[in-house]
Regions:
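Active-site entrance/lid segments in N-terminal catalytic domains of soluble metabolic enzymes
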Residues: 1-231
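Conserved active-site-proximal phosphate/metal-binding subdomains
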Residues: 74, 78, 200-237, 242-368
Length: 368
């Protein structure tokens, strides 16, 4: 899990219970990756899975496309920032010249927030913007730390990744959301396939960044596991909707060799999820989840809120440009403890979450 939910303390608490802890390094800089992997080792022993995105080339949007996407966020910006607040820059804009940040008009209407000005600069004026990290540079920080597992989301990494990982005897896992992707993974040199069903929270691991909402081969994680176990030789790891011991047993019965759990741990005391995120996970079972591109430009499942509803028919940039475009908005929403404009990633079975320690959750899983 990435996005601030995953912390050193969170992963270490999982390791202490005898489980493999996964740390999402999606957008992390190399120095942060080294620091966090070393910090985990200092706090606990056990297997660590370092997880990365496989980014695909993306073209900078036209000025018109950027303006449309920025304008689509205006209602959310206005809901979060009062006219008095609008003269104070949001995160990321402190280094911009004053003339690049729009101010409220004389009529009191809000101009573009500072994070939008920041995106105009970075998206249109940089060939290698910071929101598109180099996988090579990220992994250069990983190899010396020797995590027990490397895993990848959004596709098969370059061949050199497998060469180095195999040389260092580090297994490589890759997410698949349908059989076609799983067969590509099997031919790549990976050691196992993570079968990510449609119930899973967070980003869908689809290889195609513009995959439609209804393109899944399977209607559930269990069905996907069954299909992949029948057609693939590699071990299959079930992910998505695995919340309790019964879910684990159901996945294993269909051919999974292991399971990967995310949402079940989100409401744990040690989780880095925001207080309002945890509150909604355990206190609003009827809120429901939705697959949306609104926050990042790629399909991701999270709790429904005002932002996901507002953005259903509005302009969205390609991934990961939209992620950068909404960064300031999400940060401002978190500072205001307002869950309606945060990316509250969660699987469709989130109502089974409990407010408890990681230790208590693992005990429940073992005793059932």
């Amino acid at each position: 899990m990435a996005g601030g939910v995953c912390t050193v303390e969170f992963v270490a608490s999982v390791l202490r219970e005898g489980l493999m802890g996964s740390f999402g390094f999606a957008y992390s800089k190399p120095e942060a990756i080294s620091t966090e992997l070393r910090a985990i080792r200092k706090q606990a022993t056990g297997p660590v899975n370092a997880n990365f995105f496989v980014f695909q080339p993306v073209q900078a949007p036209s000025a018109d496309a950027l303006r449309q996407a920025a304008d689509a966020l205006r209602p959310a910006v206005e809901a979060l920032i009062t006219p008095a607040d609008a003269t104070r820059p949001l995160a990321g804009a402190q280094d911009l010249p004053a003339e690049s940040v729009d101010r409220p008009s004389e009529e009191g209407e809000l101009g573009d927030s500072a994070h939008l000005a920041f995106i105009k600069e970075s998206v249109l004026g940089a060939s290698t913007p910071e929101f598109y990290p180099s996988l090579h540079d990220q992994l250069e920080a990983v190899w010396p730390e020797r995590p027990e597992v490397l895993s990848f989301h959004f596709g098969v990494p370059p061949h050199w990744v497998f060469e180095r990982a195999h040389a260092d005897q580090i297994p490589v896992l890759i997410s698949a959301t349908k059989l076609e992707e799983a067969l590509a993974i099997e031919a790549s040199g990976a050691c196992a396939i993570i079968a990510q069903g449609p119930e899973a929270g967070g980003h869908r691991g689809c290889f195609d960044p513009k995959a439609p909402l209804d393109r899944d081969d399977a209607s559930s994680t269990i069905e996907l596991v069954r299909v992949l176990a029948r057609h693939c030789k590699l071990p299959v790891i079930a992910a998505g909707g695995i919340m309790n011991a019964e879910d684990i047993q159901a996945a294993l019965a269909q051919g999974a060799k292991a399971v990967q759990m995310g949402t079940a741990f989100l409401a744990c005391h040690e989780s880095g999820a925001s207080p309002e995120h945890k509150r909604l996970l355990t206190g609003e079972p009827g809120r429901g989840t939705v697959l949306t591109r609104a926050f990042s430009g790629r399909l991701a499942r999270g709790l429904q809120n005002e932002f996901t509803a507002m953005m259903q028919s509005r302009a969205v940039l390609d991934f990961p440009l939209q992620n950068s475009l909404t960064a300031g908005l999400r940060q401002q929403s978190a500072r205001a403890a307002n869950p309606e404009y945060q990316s509250l990633w969660a699987g469709s079975a989130y109502a089974k979450c409990r407010s408890e320690s990681v230790s208590d959750l693992v005990l429940r899983l073992e005793q059932a």
